[in-house]
Amino acid sequence: MNVETITSRQNPLMTHLRKLASSRSYRKKSGEYLCDGTKLLDEALKWGAPVQTAVFSDGVEIPTLPDTVRAVCVSEDLMRSVSPMETPQGALFTVALPETKLPETLAGKHYLVLDSVQDPGNVGTILRTADAFECDGVFLVNACADLFNPKTARATMGAIFRREAYSVTPEELFALLSKSGVPLYGTALREDTVPLSDANLSKAAVAIGSERRGLSQQMLDECAKTLKIPMSPRCESLNAAIAATVVLWEMYR
């Protein structure tokens, strides 16, 4: 396996990696996204993700890579200068963006909708949990964190390489759910709210809102009913990722 050595921070590849880390529009334009860590690289290779380039710190054991992957070695100092993480894990790699196309109809039974969930760690953790509980799909609407942000990808722990997720407009989502006969429920309080454990989730999409604002009015207007997670009156709300975990577990069991 041929491994290049790069020493300059101004090298075009290093500049490319920094842009992938910081710019959603650049990721879309270049057709690649950036991931961090040897464990995540192992997951990418295991699940056949289209890895393009892999960069390793000096001293890190380089795994067997497909012949199509460009392998590069850099100093630890150079790795710190390009890594989007405060504590680099010894490897950065780029993956081709998937050509995700919305299906004509939804064949599954359990879906999760994220409405303005803007923290990358929360979005990544939710996708990881959706994978664990065999959710049939996750939809991101209204300025959610980018699924392909390096921090989001890292938090998925590999689920990004095997679980379907779609960034859609509210109108696209509502039309698809209606066409597929999948009712939309939301985690919010209003006159028709029922406890989550009492809801019929045998076929449903459940929307989770941001911690600051909850569900958007547009989303609430489309919800057939709203659901609440019973909790101590001392607590006003749950972290979005925790709320999603409870919902996903109820749909799974």
Identify the role of each PLM range.
Residues 1-60, 144-145:
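Boundary-proximal intrinsically disordered activation/regulatory segments immediately upstream
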Residues 4-8, 72-75, 163-173:
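Short acidic-hydrophobic, aromatic-tinged amphipathic segments that line or gate anion-handling sites
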Residues 46, 98-99, 103-190:
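RNA substrate-binding interface of SAM-dependent RNA methyltransferases
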Residues 63, 68-96:
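Glycine/small-residue-rich loop that forms an oxyanion/phosphate-binding "nest" at active or ligand-binding sites
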Residues 66-76, 109, 202-205, 224:
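Active-site regions of enzymes building and remodeling cell-envelope glycoconjugates
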Residues 74-75, 115, 141-142, 164, ...:
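Short beta->alpha connector loops at strand-helix junctions that form conserved
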Residues 93, 132-133, 147-160, 217-253:
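Structured adenosyl-cofactor binding patch, chiefly the S-adenosyl-L-methionine
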Residues 185-235, 239:
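Active-site/ligand-binding-proximal alpha/beta "capping" segment
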